[in-house]
């Protein structure tokens, strides 16, 4: 490549055509050098040479500002500090993947058996081909390119709505700002933002030298850097990126790529300048999956970054389409984790934590021990039965691990280490916080405080849950402020939050008038919410974000949910008898209804609509399978229509299948249905069937 700096005249003396040609050449050279340095780890020029070209480009763009484009290397850090992160709805949901609980070879065998069963394969059919990738311990990210330029980067968030962090992601030099001409007009690349261990250690050293905040582990450091409001701070953090998949992309029929395998897709992303992990491999069948899991695990500590397992993906994209998705996870992928790292330490005490629902959780206070990249001082003991099973006592030397490499827990007591007799731990008869009676319901392992919102601990946890980002998202309402509000008896229940005023808040410790006003503004903003967020924020037992969305989608209004019978609740997707009974009991309690009424009276509101009309149960008792791509309906929409008509939608074809609904690129399921003589319908035929035609 010719040196674009040769015979470089004064930028101000160049006409627009000359400047444009020189700018294009410099950008091409800088992008090439940056790819060699940041992606390939193979720099080809000294830093001084890169800096000289970069400064020349800056001078040219300053002299000819009309020629500046968003994908220029000089545009990686730009703009003022943001006031907040903007929510972004993903064009396609960023779903999580299922985790195999068996960390040995059985995990690979279970996944392979499940995939074969879903596809209707027998032992006589050939082994399935899989791609095996490292499971990075970082932050999931979606990069959206339009007309081959990076226009948006968003975090996963709750899978449907993330946060726009484009200003920060542009600072990561491994991520291309522009793509080659053979890339499609629309491309959303999904991957992981992470930090190498050596870079993390160096960052903490710099922070300590500057008396700054140090970080617990590389993942937390990366996540915090990505969510900065000031991109200049993010630019100083050594963030990196690995690509591992796609979201929205131009369809093959509209000029987009037509990949046949996931592995081919990864190689294309690599050719477009995206970093792809070197440890990606191909496996055929369960035995090869288990072998790669073991091989990568053996090299785990030698890798420059943290992984907590591997991810298996069915390689053939047509088979991925055939397998489809469960409610929140793809059927064609799974995470197979490694056994957690373990270390010995001493139990210095056992204390009780009272949770939002009154659950009393014993927590072991430990002599500090470094496990899996963090210093651990506390570990959960779960419940009294777990303590008795493991025979944990104060003073014991125990083995501690980070379960899933995240949550510390006590594995067991090291034999022969108990120095003297210590009494067994006993669960108290009364709550250590409020003095209310402690009970254990029949069939449950957990003890609970009966104090309800009378218990300050439960009240505090309920307020924090209500204010959480994925609930009412009340910015500034953290644990220290909640402690003050409850201890000062300014807030006894959720509605009291909306009765706070500037005078009362300003009188609190470390609460200046500006901070108080900011909280009042956040409370005002939270009054406009959504029904799923409100339901989740109430902290109902067994009701997480996904169940809250299912309830809102099914019933449409809060009143319909509150007045639903157990039988009506059981009709909601993924709700079983325990959850239905718990929900019904909650809304039958006058106190809970009064809390909801007061919150509404305080101005909380959300869009509501009547639940969707359900077609007659024309397909009651029928088993239906979906395969391929339908012309107008998405897979979930088609499933909803069929289930609303009483059908059971399954993932595999068998003799019990009543109908196969087949779209474009239908694969093995279509062949199996024809072999068994099962009626095959297209989308129009399905709609006609639902209409009773």
Curated annotation (Swiss-Prot):
Zn(2+) binds at residues 431, 434, 449, 455. This is DNA ligase. It is an enzyme of class 6 (ligase). PROSITE patterns: BRCT (PS50172), DNA_LIGASE_N1 (PS01055), DNA_LIGASE_N2 (PS01056). Belongs to the NAD-dependent DNA ligase family. LigA subfamily. Keywords: DNA damage, DNA repair, DNA replication, Ligase, Magnesium, Manganese, Metal-binding, NAD, Zinc. The lineage of its organism: Bacteria, Pseudomonadati, Pseudomonadota, Betaproteobacteria, Burkholderiales. DNA ligase that catalyzes the formation of phosphodiester linkages between 5'-phosphoryl and 3'-hydroxyl groups in double-stranded DNA using NAD as a coenzyme and as the energy source for the reaction. It is essential for DNA replication and repair of damaged DNA. PANTHER family: CHROMOSOME TRANSMISSION FIDELITY FACTOR 18, DNA LIGASE. SUPFAM superfamilies: BRCT domain, DNA ligase/mRNA capping enzyme, catalytic domain, Nucleic acid-binding proteins, RuvA domain 2-like. Its cofactor is Mg(2+); Mn(2+). CDD domains: LIGANc. InterPro entries: BRCT_dom, BRCT_dom_sf, DisA/LigA_HHH, DNA_ligase, DNA_ligase_AS, DNA_ligase_CS, DNAligase_adenylation, DNAligase_N. NAD(+) binds at residues 47-51, 96-97, 133, 156, 192, 313, 337. Its EC number is 6.5.1.2. GO terms for biological process: DNA repair; DNA replication. GO terms for cellular component: cytosol.
């Amino acid at each position: 490549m010719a040196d674009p700096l040769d015979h470089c005249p004064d930028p101000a003396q160049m006409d627009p055509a000359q400047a444009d040609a020189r700018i294009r050449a410099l950008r091409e050279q800088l992008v090439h050098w940056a790819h060699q340095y940041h992606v390939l780890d193979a720099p080809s020029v000294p830093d001084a040479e890169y800096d000289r070209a970069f400064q020349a480009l800056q001078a040219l763009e300053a002299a000819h500002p009309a020629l500046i484009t968003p994908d220029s290397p000089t545009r990686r850090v730009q703009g003022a500090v943001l006031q907040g992160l903007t929510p972004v709805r993903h064009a396609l949901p960023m779903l999580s993947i299922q985790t195999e609980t068996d960390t040995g070879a059985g995990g690979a065998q279970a996944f392979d058996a499940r995939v074969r069963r879903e596809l209707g394969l027998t032992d006589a059919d050939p082994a399935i081909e899989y791609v095996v990738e490292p499971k990075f311990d970082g932050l999931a990210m979606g990069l959206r390119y339009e007309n081959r330029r990076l226009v948006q980067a968003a975090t996963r968030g709750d899978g449907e709505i993330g946060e726009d962090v484009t200003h920060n992601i542009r600072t990561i030099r491994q991520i291309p700002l522009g793509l080659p001409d053979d890339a499609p007009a629309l491309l959303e690349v999904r991957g992981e933002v992470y930090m190498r261990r050596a870079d993390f250690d160096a960052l903490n050293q710099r922070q300590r030298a500057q008396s700054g905040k140090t970080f617990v582990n590389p993942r937390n450091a990366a996540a915090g850097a990505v969510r900065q409001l000031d991109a200049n701070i993010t630019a100083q953090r050594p963030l990196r990126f690995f690509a591992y998949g796609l979201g929205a992309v131009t369809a093959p029929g509209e000029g987009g790529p037509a990949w046949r395998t996931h592995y081919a897709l990864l190689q294309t992303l690599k050719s477009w300048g995206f970093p792809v992990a070197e440890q990606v491999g191909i496996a055929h069948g369960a035995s090869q999956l288990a072998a790669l899991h073991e091989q990568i695990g053996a090299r785990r500590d030698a890798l420059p970054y943290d992984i907590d397992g591997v991810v298996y993906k069915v390689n053939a994209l047509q088979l991925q389409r055939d397998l489809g998705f469960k409610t929140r996870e793809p059927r064609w992928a799974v995470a197979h984790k490694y056994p957690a790292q373990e270390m010995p330490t001493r139990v210095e005490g056992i204390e009780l934590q009272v949770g939002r629902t009154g659950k009393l959780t014993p927590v072991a206070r430990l002599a500090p021990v470094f496990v899996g990249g963090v210093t651990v001082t506390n570990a959960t003991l779960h419940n009294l039965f777990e303590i008795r099973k493991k025979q944990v006592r104060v003073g014991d030397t125990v083995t501690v691990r980070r379960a899933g490499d995240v949550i510390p827990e006590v594995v067991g007591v090291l034999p022969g280490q108990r120095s003297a007799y210590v009494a067994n731990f006993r669960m108290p008869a009364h709550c250590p916080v409020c003095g209310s009676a402690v009970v254990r319901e029949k069939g449950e392992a957990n003890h609970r405080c009966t104090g309800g919102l009378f218990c300050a601990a439960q009240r505090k946890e309920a307020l924090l849950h209500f204010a959480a980002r994925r609930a009412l998202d009340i910015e500034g309402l953290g644990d220290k402020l909640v402690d003050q509000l409850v201890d000062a008896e300014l807030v006894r229940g959720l509605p009291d939050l909306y009765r706070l005023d500037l005078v009362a808040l300003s009188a609190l410790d470390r609460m200046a008038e500006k901070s108080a006003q900011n909280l009042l503004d956040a409370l005002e903003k939270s009054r406009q919410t959504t029904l799923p967020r409100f339901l989740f924020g109430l902290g109902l037992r067994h009701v997480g974000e996904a169940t809250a969305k299912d309830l809102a989608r099914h019933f449409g209004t809060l009143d319909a949910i509150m007045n639903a019978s157990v039988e009506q609740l059981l009709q909601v997707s993924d709700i079983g008898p325990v959850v239905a009974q718990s929900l019904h009991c909650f809304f039958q309690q006058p106190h809970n209804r009064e809390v909801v009424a007061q919150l509404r009276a305080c101005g909380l509101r959300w869009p509501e609509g009547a639940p969707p009309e359900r077609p007659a149960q024309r397909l009651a008792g029928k088993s239906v399978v979906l395969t391929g791509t339908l012309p107008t309906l998405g897979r979930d929409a088609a499933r909803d229509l069929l289930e609303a008509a009483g059908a059971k939608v399954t993932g595999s074809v068998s003799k019990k299948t009543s109908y196969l609904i087949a779209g474009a690129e239908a694969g093995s399921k279509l062949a199996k249905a024809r072999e068994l003589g099962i009626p095959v319908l297209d989308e129009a035929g399905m709609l006609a069937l639902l209409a009773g035609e």
